[in-house]
Swiss-Prot record:
Name listed for the protein in its UniProt record: Large ribosomal subunit protein uL5
This protein's GO CC annotations: ribonucleoprotein complex; ribosome
Family per similarity comment: Belongs to the universal ribosomal protein uL5 family.
Matching Pfam families: Ribosomal_L5, Ribosomal_L5_C
Organism in which the protein naturally occurs: Prochlorococcus marinus (strain MIT 9515)
InterPro entries: Ribosomal_uL5, Ribosomal_uL5_bac-type, Ribosomal_uL5_C, Ribosomal_uL5_CS, Ribosomal_uL5_dom_sf, Ribosomal_uL5_N
GO molecular function terms listed in the Swiss-Prot or TrEMBL record: rRNA binding; structural constituent of ribosome; tRNA binding
Amino acid sequence: MTLKTRYKETIRPKLLKDLGLKNIHQVPKVIKVNVNRGLGEAASNSKALEASLNEMATITGQKALVTRSKKAIAGFKIREGMAIGCTVTLRGDRMYSFLERFINLALPRIRDFRGVNPKSFDGRGNYTLGVKEQLIFPEISFDKIDSIRGMDITIVTSASNDQEGKALLKELGMPFSN
């Protein structure tokens, strides 16, 4: 059973009852997942950006968007409009597919993993976590990477507060630490 069908058939009715909501449309759901990677080294190394774009496309199954600097910062040696990162916004079936692979395959592969931090909510039910290396994803092989880079993953939900967001992610299988 995929994560999407599990959400519709078992998680949504359970959350409706647990959160004491009156309507099925009030139940929180995952709206989108943003996967972002900042690449300060892309200013001097154009191959880093290209490799990063390919990795993001492999991990998410969707082409990454190049993020560019809004203004020049001399201390960081960047000019306005320089490529300094890449981002992917996942929605729909790709989002559920990525979440399922991330929760069930990637997170358990983190060294000394004891669960994700339950305090990383933003106050509006959205959850953000950082990943230190891309090797936790089974699609990335150690031989094909040039350097280890991390990424930020933001899960945007329709929850109105952190308690609803945490209940949703816990039901989806997110392993929170105590």
